[in-house]
A protein has these predicted regions:
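Mature soluble binding/inhibitory domains
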Residues: 21-409
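Bacterial N-terminal signal peptides that target proteins for export
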Residues: 1-7
Length: 409
């Protein structure tokens, strides 16, 4: 298939550029892409790439934000592994975005002042109807280990990718079904090893479930990868599974000690399950528990194993990838383009894809990076639900690429 030029794709997608000739015709009123106002009575509950279960609140009149870490593997203090920032909150002020191409887009995007650890990379939130995505405050991680084990190299994350929903499905019977799962995890105590999440998950109404992994240390196995899903006691509306198997081997533990939290957003009449793995570590023996490290953490998305029709998911989506870059994804038929929405003309920052809707597994659209050294061999996978997609590419198996995007227009 001959790939369209980036310029022609851009002109077809108003999020990225304004193209064509002028006109004196009256302009139709701008249709908002998000609520005209928000306050703290609306809470976006969701997951972060850090493995955190988060509540985000915005007040677009007072221009303030608040992030509450309900569950977290991220240490509260650099140089330690516990306690984490679970149960704590951060606050700050908002600035409406001005760097997007149109007012329609800027009025639904905000910078979270004080949230980033790198002033050249602002933390931003993009708001839609019932969904908010972007980034939440980052953290500098470092730990010297215990007797040479569990060392976490010094690294500063300016922010973490996040997606959350204003309405959740809290009845597990309504979540039961078979899903494709795509995501990524990182293991800080293994030099931040990045691991793909690629599996099939079947969830039953009684909380029992099964995961069949296509990658990771459990590739080829089908098993219940944690305790039965139940309502999390933290009151977040999420479901929890204990002793949740990771995609890698724990650094210092005989078995899985991390937890899984499934946040099921309700969006456009569909469920959008986000499954995070929240790792854990203990560096002391004062509690009578020996030191341990099962700090693999991350995020994934689930979507039903239901066939996706060609052209049914066309449109523009916005999100953040696991390289901590903001991404607009324009999908048109069998082609997709990922572009930096703040620098849309920079071709070097873009990624062009060919999509294949054959779907040997229902609901799993494969993709090929145009011009990649892998040629026409599919290295990527897309899943879709409720106007949200998850995209995993393993062109380089040691550094899988992942992003979640939500529909804009």
């Amino acid at each position: 298939m001959k790939w369209k030029t980036l310029a022609s794709i851009a002109c077809a997608t108003p999020l990225l550029y304004a193209c064509g000739g002028g006109s004196d015709a009256p302009q139709a009123p701008v249709v908002r892409l998000c609520p005209a106002s928000l306050d703290y009575t609306t809470t976006f509950t969701g997951g972060a790439g850090s493995g955190e279960l988060v509540r985000l609140q915005l007040d677009t009149t007072k221009l303030t934000w608040q992030v509450t870490y309900v569950e977290s593997p991220i240490p509260a203090t650099t140089g330690t592994v516990s306690p984490t920032r679970a149960g704590t909150s951060q606050t700050g002020t908002l600035t409406m975005e001005t760097g997007l191409p149109t007012q329609k887009l800027n009025q639904c995007a905000y910078q979270l002042n004080g949230a980033t650890l790198d002033p050249t990379r602002p933390a931003r939130i993009f708001v839609g109807e019932g969904v908010a995505g972007g980034t939440i405050p980052g953290k500098e991680l470092q730990f010297g280990g215990v007797l040479g084990q569990g060392v976490v190299p010094d690294r500063t994350f300016p922010y973490y990718p996040f997606i959350g929903f204003s309405t959740l499905e809290t009845n597990l019977a309504n979540v039961a079904g078979t899903y494709n799962q795509l995501g990524y995890h990182e293991i800080p105590s293994q030099s931040y090893a990045r691991i793909a999440v690629d599996s099939k998950i079947t969830i039953n109404a009684d909380g029992t479930w099964q995961e069949c992994d296509n990658s990771g240390v459990n590739a080829g196995k089908c098993q219940q990868a944690g305790s039965n899903f139940t309502q999390s006691p933290d009151g977040s509306g999420a479901f929890v599974t204990n002793n949740f198997l990771g995609q890698g081997t724990p650094t210092l533990a005989l078995g899985p000690l991390g937890k899984g939290y499934m946040i099921v957003g309700k969006l456009n009449g569909q469920n959008v399950p986000i499954l995070i793995r929240t790792g854990t570590a203990n560096a002391t023996i004062t509690t009578g528990i020996p030191p341990f490290a099962d700090d693999e953490s991350g995020i994934s998305m689930l979507s039903p194993q239901t066939a996706i029709a060609l052209n049914s998911v066309n449109g523009e989506y916005v999100g953040v990838d696991n390289a901590f870059d903001y991404r607009t994804t324009a999908i048109a038929g069998t082609q997709a383009t990922l572009i930096d929405p703040f620098q849309p003309s920079q071709v070097a920052l873009s990624r062009a894809l060919n999509l294949d809707y054959t779907q040997s597994i229902a609901g799993l659209v494969t993709s090929t990076v145009v011009g990649a050294s892998t040629g026409a061999t599919p290295t990527g996978k897309f899943i879709f639900s409720g106007g949200v997609f998850g995209y995993l590419d393993q062109s380089n198996p040691t550094t899988p690429y992942y992003t979640i995007g939500s529909f804009v227009q």
